[in-house]
């Protein structure tokens, strides 16, 4: 179907000479779950045009899609950079046959929980279109690693484990761009300067090993689409039982429909640490079982604890923690997560061990033992609906913080990527009042220079709160506020200690935000939003630095910066309340998910994150 992993070479090497067969080009970005997600055909045409002009330059995506205004692609390093948050993600240039779905402009999409449509990954879209063109009644996605059946007659997708149905649709769009010539040698995303060596960072190693093992599985399996009725679905699993007082967390569904709700598929098998002190808990994608691959090693005598368990594992054989390791008999491959499946596919020995359980909550605390935080008044803060003031004129806001430059240097504007001595890339794209497209200015504190029209475009795409943030150094001009929906923040001291802070008690923060209707400052005004997992409990040590963090978190809460409405990186659900770039510790007595203690760098790191949001000690509210 495609040439997976075919990417741009480093340092502007040739992207293909004339004479080879034509190929369809699809640009993709790597999300936090290790899945490559396609850009739209319009964006891909824009990137290809920029590539022909300068194969080592940068591409501002906001020039063709206003929703992508903060995003820039660096063709030299093959990364996508988000200017307002500093988030960096790898990108790649993938190739497909002209007769495939991208070449025809065909997009297959599934309906998410919010009622909006999400496109399938490119290769899944191609597989669905191929089956559709051959008039197959359905397509089983099991051999692609997803426990779903796609029914073409009813145009729905069925989860083989839970029987849940989702609507799907086929629509026509702009065809993806064509390129002629030889395809560059496959490699991971470019690193270094012409070294030709694969990247050795943990993320690259993880993705490359996963890709290699997945290709080995798919090479031994062929998608079989019989003409008869689909195979019988297994009975739905019994509802999980959860301890009282604990809320069920969201996990990856393991399906082509993205990241579903809890109970729709495989369970997660833990978090992936990123070594930065802010490791985001990521559910490992649970692939559906493959025929003949459910003969994992029996746990046998490995089901013991402590040193006896480790002693029974042969030397050199990795131990694979499994959550649902109870009783006797063979263990279903899905329980071992993607890691177990890949190791079994490679023929490596695996010993299953019982996975440790995170300690999410402290022991029960009576009301008499709960005390206020020293030096902080009250125990609760509430935010209400934002009362929208008269919208400030974007041109006036930008002029307040920017100074005119009469003779700009001949260098790039890092917002539109055009030269400062030429007109802004947003000339003709943005309606503006009395600002010449060639006018250049510099910000007062940091002296970074841009076309004046470019910060106006960024302000128009933001919260319009009268503040401005430099996309280069992140310096904030004015007081930045967010779009956090109404809710309540409680805080108090409990008589228990966090791991690594045995000399003090613990500050517990409880956030509670109800579901509601989106306002004019939100992504989809007038549409409902969900609030999953609330109330959320977070923990800080009750010492000087912990209390300082609490005071700044209170200021961030008042400015509506803690949460936002967006798409969950855990479940893929859109129009839901998500964390907003300020990390919290939600695991009380352990650090198995990366969201707990001990973590000696956490307090310093969260202070840095608050500073980036413009929340600093001297500017915080007097609590």
Curated annotation (Swiss-Prot):
Gene: dtx1
Function recorded in the entry: Regulator of Notch signaling, a signaling pathway involved in cell-cell communications that regulates a broad spectrum of cell-fate determinations. Probably acts both as a positive and negative regulator of Notch, depending on the developmental and cell context. Functions as a ubiquitin ligase protein in vivo, mediating ubiquitination and promoting degradation of MEKK1, suggesting that it may regulate the Notch pathway via some ubiquitin ligase activity.
Protein's pathway: Protein modification; protein ubiquitination
Enzyme class label: transferase
Subunit structure: May form a homo- or heterodimer with other members of the Deltex family. Probably interacts with Notch1.
Polar residues: compositionally biased ranges: 292-311
Protein name: E3 ubiquitin-protein ligase DTX1
Species per Swiss-Prot/TrEMBL record: Xenopus laevis
Keyword Zinc-finger included in the entry's annotation: yes
Chain intervals annotated as zinc finger (RING-type): 413-474
Record Gene3D superfamilies: 3.30.390.130, 3.30.720.50, Zinc/RING finger domain, C3HC4 (zinc finger)
Region of interest called Disordered, as start-end residue ranges on this chain: 224-319
One Pfam family matching this protein: WWE
Keywords from the UniProt entry: Metal-binding, Notch signaling pathway, Repeat, Transferase, Ubl conjugation pathway, Zinc, Zinc-finger
